[in-house]
């Protein structure tokens, strides 16, 4: 397995609601957060990389929409996820 696959499997295992869960909002938000955190140093070093920045902004928007959905669906799960990932300080 590649390093990214191992990290992905670990993130899914840590945030899954059941054994085969890969699509719950918690898992999706956690995976997006990991990808966003990996890209952030790239933009500190490459400020003019606007093409990749657009992809980053799309990921941030998708994460925000998933969090909004989860907040409306189950507020307790939303708060637990925000606390776990350290978002919205």
From Swiss-Prot:
One of its GO terms (molecular function) is structural constituent of ribosome. InterPro entries: Ribosomal_uS15 (IPR000589), Ribosomal_uS15_bac-type (IPR005290), uS15_NS1_RNA-bd_sf (IPR009068). It comes from Polynucleobacter asymbioticus (strain DSM 18221 / CIP 109841 / QLW-P1DMWA-1). One of the primary rRNA binding proteins, it binds directly to 16S rRNA where it helps nucleate assembly of the platform of the 30S subunit by binding and bridging several RNA helices of the 16S rRNA. Belongs to the universal ribosomal protein uS15 family. Keywords: Ribonucleoprotein, Ribosomal protein, RNA-binding, rRNA-binding. PROSITE patterns: RIBOSOMAL_S15 (PS00362). GO terms for biological process: translation. Part of the 30S ribosomal subunit. Forms a bridge to the 50S subunit in the 70S ribosome, contacting the 23S rRNA. Pfam families: Ribosomal_S15. Transmembrane segments: none annotated. NCBIfam families: S15_bact. The keyword Transmembrane helix does not apply. GO terms for cellular component: cytosolic small ribosomal subunit. The keyword Ribonucleoprotein applies. This is Small ribosomal subunit protein uS15.
């Amino acid at each position: 397995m590649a390093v990214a696959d191992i990290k992905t499997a670990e993130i899914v295992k840590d945030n899954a609601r059941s054994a085969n869960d890969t699509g719950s909002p918690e898992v999706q938000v956690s995976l997006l957060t990991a990808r966003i955190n990996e890209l952030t140093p790239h933009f500190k070093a490459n400020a003019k990389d606007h093409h990749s920045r657009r992809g980053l902004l799309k990921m941030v928007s998708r994460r925000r929409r998933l969090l909004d959905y989860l907040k409306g669906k189950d507020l307790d799960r939303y708060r637990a996820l925000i606390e776990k990932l350290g978002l919205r300080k």
